[in-house]
Structures are given as C-alpha cells and as structure tokens.
Amino acid sequence: MRFVIVTGMSGAGKSTALKMLEDMGYFCVDNLPIPLLPRFVEMFSEPDEEVKKIALGIDIRGGQDFGGLKDVLDEMDVKEIEYEILFLDAQDDVLIKRYKETRRQHPLSGSGRVDTGIAKEREKIMFLKMRATYILDTSKMLTRELKLELEKIFVKGQNFCNLYITVMSFGFKYGIPSDSDLSLIHISEPTRPY
C-alpha cells in the first residue's frame, strides 16, 4: 500500500494536488479529522484490502490539533506503517495574493490580517515540513507543472530529484530571478568598437 499525506500551507495547492492524485488512481480523502486517522490507516492496512494507493489531505482548517497528528505519526512509525508526506509550500506574498484573488479568509486569521494567519500556520505546521518526504514550492508553478512534478514522484516511480539545473537568461538590472538559488555565470557581450 502507498499511503501519502498531503499537507502544507493553506493556499499552496493541497486540494488541487489531491484532485490530481485522484486522477492518478489514488483513493483521496480531504480534511479527515486527526482523531479518525489511526482507524482509517488501520482499516486500509489490511492485506486483503483492494485499495492500494491512498492520499489523505490534512490541513489547519477546522482548528485541528496538530499535536495529535505528531502522536499519530509517531505511532505509525512504531507500527512500521509506511507513509510519505507531501508538503506544499509557497512564498507568503504569493499566498496573500491567492487569498485576495479568491476573496477567502485564512483559517487562522480570524477577522484579522491574512499575513498574521499565515505566520501562525507556518509555526503550527513546521514539524510536518521537517518530517516531509517531499517538499514542493508552488509559488511559481502552473497547475500543469504541479501535475508533472506529482507524476514524477507518484506515478512514474522516479526518485525525487533534489537538484535541478535550469539555464535561464536574465538581466541583473531587473534583479536575479527569485526562484534562483545560485547564479554561477555572468556573461556579458563586450561592446563592439564599430
């Protein structure tokens, strides 16, 4: 059985990722209450169970107790139940923009500001990011790019590549691209004398 927990920041694309995993043949459940998780895992861990690929969306909606999730994951480790955690993240400014576009309120902002809710959420789910098998930053991803990444990880059986090399052209006067980790070469054409 392949058991995937899809989690991450609100607005980073968890629901979209779950829909894509469902299209890839996964049995998907979104926003399962954490107290039901042990029974859910136990039910689908039986060898004669027909469902072999499960994706479970867990997030901060509904004020779930993430301390309880840590205990459940520890218990799964003790029982040697294999699972993978897919953590979807995005830059704060991108998350704020997405909330503005949808005109939805962040689950932890209450009647306050979205950026305050994002900061609270980052703090609460940091332990999940630390335990994550895969971390995807969706800040600059299009939906089709997210689908390709998920297919690489969950369908084609390819190992997740931690090193990507992208050759791109940019002008320093506009700044280094924000998704660039390292700019190795700066090539300028010398001025021509004629």
Residue ranges of predicted features:
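Conserved glycine(s) of the Walker
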Residues: 13
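Hydrophobic anchor at the beta1->P-loop junction of P-loop NTPases
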Residues: 6
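Small-molecule kinase domains that catalyze NTP-dependent phosphoryl transfer to phosphate-bearing small molecules
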Residues: 108-143, 161, 166, 170-179
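P-loop (Walker A) phosphate-binding loop of NTP-binding proteins
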Residues: 9
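Single conserved hydrophobic/aromatic residue that forms the stacking wall/gate
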Residues: 185-194
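Post-Walker A helix-loop "phosphate-sensing" segment adjacent to the P-loop in P-loop NTPases
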Residues: 23-30
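Conserved nucleotide-sensing/catalytic segment adjacent to the nucleotide-binding pocket
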Residues: 30-33, 38-74
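Switch/connector loops and helix/strand junctions flanking conserved nucleotide-binding motifs
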Residues: 64-67, 92-99, 144, 175-178
